[in-house]
Amino acid sequence: MRGLISRIFGFVAAIKFPRFLQTFINEKYVSGFKIDMSEFKEPKEYESLTALFTRELQRPRDFDVSPQAFISPSDGTCLERGVSKELKAISVKGHEYGIAELLGDSIDRSERGAELEYVNIYLSPRDYHRYHAPCDMRILSALYVPGE
């Protein structure tokens, strides 16, 4: 049921309503979820809920540059962090998954018996939904894991 609701929301959120109606929808979404828009354009500037949901920062954020700092790639709430030994299960959105089930063949065979650290970050509808890296880097591969 959760997947169906997400698909319906995604479909409706992509619709570009007439400006007066879109402004009303955006403002209700922002106030309903108590979104802090101080780092973003005004709600009326977004042509759809999808555009608002995936809004860009007006300027780059500052972050802690100390070597001991953990910089999260996204806004959100850290639900869980830990070490998974021998690919034991972790919880994501209320379901238990083995790391191999989540990441499949992307795990190097040499890591399969190793202790792997993980962080589970929940992005609520009010959170900023873009990801950033606090360093110069090049992505060598990406893996899409569809939800239910």
PLM region spans:
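Non-catalytic terminal segments and appended small domains
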Residues: M1-E148
